[in-house]
Amino acid sequence: MLSARNSLKNISRQFPKALTRAQSTAAAPTGPVIGIDLGTTNSAVAVMEGKTPKILENSEGGRTTPSIVAFTKDGERLVGIPAKRQAVVNPSDTLFATKRLIGRRYEDPEVQRDINQVPYKIVKHGNGDAWLEARGEQYSPQQIGGFILNKMKETAEAALSKKVNSAVVTCPAYFNDAQRQATKDAGKIVGLNVLRVINEPTAAALAYGLEKKDGEVVAVFDLGGGTFDVSILDIGAGVFEVKSTNGDTHLGGEDFDIALVRYIVDAFKKESGIDLEKDKMAIQRIREAAEKAKIELSSTVSTEINLPFITADASGPKHINQKISRAQFEQLVEPLIKKTIEPCKKALKDAGLSTSDVSEVILVGGMSRMPKVVETVKSIFGKEPSKGINPDEAVAMGAAIQGGILAGEVKDVVLLDVTPLSLGIETMGGVFARLISRNTTIPAKKSQIFSTAAAGQTSVEIRVFQGERELTRDNKLIGNFTLSGIPPAPKGVPQIEVTFDIDTDGIIKVSARDKATNKDASITVAGSSGLSDAEIEKMVNDAEKFAESDKARREAIEFANRADQLCNDTENSLNEHKEKLSSESVQKVQDQIQQLREIVLKAQAGEEVSPEELKQKTEELQNEAINLFKDLYKDGGESSGSSEQPKN
C-alpha cells in the first residue's frame, strides 16, 4: 500500500500533439487511410476525396453493411447482407450485435442478460471473457469484429482499386480501456493497421463541423444499435475540443427490438397459448419483423406484422397478424428513451454549460430518427436538432477526416478528445488518489510522488482504479502490478513516482519508479473487464449523491493516517529516551497512543468514526508529547550545555 506525500506537488504535463505515442509508434500510413464506423447493427466505410469525405458502397450496392457474420453448414463464412439474408434458416450460427460483448467478461450482468436474448451461443473463454460459438468453433468478439472490418477493407479496396492497410476505427465514447484495446485488436486480427481509435460522437462532430469557421458549442446525441453517447464540443477555427462526454454502453436499437419482440411473443402466447421463446427460427423471424416495424414507425403512424406459419400445434398452423401503432411502440420503449435524459444533463454540467450555451444539437445513429427520440432531445436542449448530416454515415465520414489528418491530407484541424472517467490508485486506508480526472483532454500524462506505508517495505502493489468516488472500494479495479526491489527504509522515506499515460486512443499505461534506484514496473491496462452501463451510471450518480459523505470519510482517513504517523513518531521518541523519563509519564503517553491507534485502525478500515473524537485524542497525545519532550530537552540542555539538535 502507498501513502501520499502531501508535501510534494503533483507533476502534470501533456504530450505535444506531434509526439503522442499513438502517432510515434504507429507505422507510417502507406496508401489511403480509410475511416470505419464499426457499428453494433451496421458498419460503414469512408475515405477522403480531396477535402471531402465520401461513403463507399459495398459489393451489394449498400452504403452501410449489416454487422452480421454467419457460418453455414458448408463451411462458408458470410459477412454483411448475405449473412443477414440467411439468418432465419440459420439462427444458431448467425452472429449479430457482437460489439456489445467486446472487452466484456462472461460474468458481466449485461452478458448474462444477452445470453437469453440471442439465438446463438455465448460461452465463457478460459480467460473469463465472453466468447461466441458457431458450428462447434469458438470465436472472440474481436474476431467477429475483425471479419466485419475486413469486409469494410475489401469494400474500400474494390472502390479505390488500391490496397488498403491503414484505418481509423470508431468506438463509443464511453468504451473503457479494455473495449478500446479490443477494438484495435479486431483490426490487427485481419492485418489492418488501426492508426487511431476515435470516439463516435467526436467523429460525427468532425463530419458536421469541418467547413465551419465560427465558434460553436455542439451537442452530439448518438443513439445507435447498441450504445448511447452524448458529447459536448467546442468547434471553431479548425479546433474540435471535447468539453465532456457521458453515455451508456448497453443502450441502443437492439434493446428497442428486444422490447418489441417480447411484446409480440407475449401477445401471441396470450392469444394461442403457445410460447415461442425457445423456438429459435420463430424468434429470428419475429426479430427481423420487429426491426422492420420499428423503422417503419418512424415515418408512419401504424404498421402490421404478418408472419404466416410461425408455428403449429394439433389444431394446425399458427400465424402472427398483429397491428402496432406508433403510440403503442413509444409507450413500450419509453423507459429506454428516458435513460438518455440524465447522461445529457450530466454532460452539460461537466462541461460547465447550460442548454442556452449550445448552438446546435446533432443527431447520430439510426435510433435518433425515431420521432419520440427527436422530441426528447428537443425537450432536453430546448431547440430543434440539426438535420444537416446523415445519422447513419456521419461517424464513418468523421473517421475518414481523422484518417486524412493523420495522412497529412487534411490541414489545420486539431482534435482534442477526453477520457470519460477519473483514473487513480489506491493509497493507505483505501483512499482513491485521483491522478487524472474525468473529461481530461487526451493524450495526457500525469505523475505524482507516493511513499511506503510501513517501515522496511521492499515492494509496493499499485492498484489502478477507474471511477468517481473518494474510496477505492466504491470504484472499479481495472489493473494491478507490483514494484519490487525498494531498499528497506523507514516508513514514508522512499519516493515512488507513479505516472498515468493515456494515449490518443484512450488506452492507459501506468508505471511506478523508485527514484532512489530507478527501478520501475508498469502495466498497460488492457485485460480488464468492461464497465457495465449500470456501473458507469452508478459511479457518476453515487459520486454526486455521496459527495459530502465521501469527502468526510476521506478526510477522516487522511486525518487518521496523520494521527498514525504521530503515534509512530511519539513511540520512537519514547523508546529512544525512555530511561530519562518517569515511568508514570511514559505509561500515560503509551495509553494515549493505544487509545488513538484503536480509533485510527477503525478509520483506516472504513468504519464510521467520530472526527471530533479522533481530533481530540490526537491533540491530547500531541500536547502530552510536546510537554514531556520539552522538559526532557530543557533538562538535557541545562545539564550538558550542548547545542546539538534533537534526533529526528
Curated annotation (Swiss-Prot):
Further details from the record: Has antigenic properties. Elicits a specific immune response in systemic candidiasis human patients undergoing malignant hematological disorders.
Q: What is this protein called?
A: Heat shock protein SSC1, mitochondrial
Q: What does this protein do?
A: Required for the translocation of transit peptide-containing proteins from the inner membrane into the mitochondrial matrix in an ATP-dependent manner. Constitutes the ATP-driven core of the motor and binds the precursor preprotein.
Q: Keyword RNA-binding, does the record have it? A: no
Please report which protein family the annotation says this sequence is part of. Answer: Belongs to the heat shock protein 70 family.
The molecular function terms of the Gene Ontology recorded here are: ATP binding; ATP hydrolysis activity; ATP-dependent protein folding chaperone; heat shock protein binding; protein folding chaperone; unfolded protein binding
Q: Which residues form a coiled coil?
A: 560-633
The organism encoding this protein is Candida albicans (strain SC5314 / ATCC MYA-2876) (Yeast)
The source's superkingdom equals Eukaryota
Q: Where is the transit peptide?
A: 1-23
Alphabetically sorted, this entry's keywords are:
ATP-binding, Chaperone, Coiled coil, Mitochondrion, Nucleotide-binding, Stress response, Transit peptide
Choose any GO biological process term that the UniProt entry carries and state it. Answer: chaperone cofactor-dependent protein refolding
Q: Which GO terms describe its cellular component?
A: cell surface; cytoplasm; fungal biofilm matrix; mitochondrial matrix; mitochondrion; plasma membrane; yeast-form cell wall
- Pfam families per the record? HSP70 (PF00012)
Q: Which InterPro entries match?
A: ATPase_NBD, Chaperone_DnaK, Heat_shock_70_CS, HSP70_C_sf, HSP70_peptide-bd_sf, Hsp_70_fam
Localization annotation: Mitochondrion matrix
> Which SUPFAM superfamilies does UniProt cross-reference here?
Actin-like ATPase domain (SSF53067), Heat shock protein 70kD (HSP70), peptide-binding domain (SSF100920)
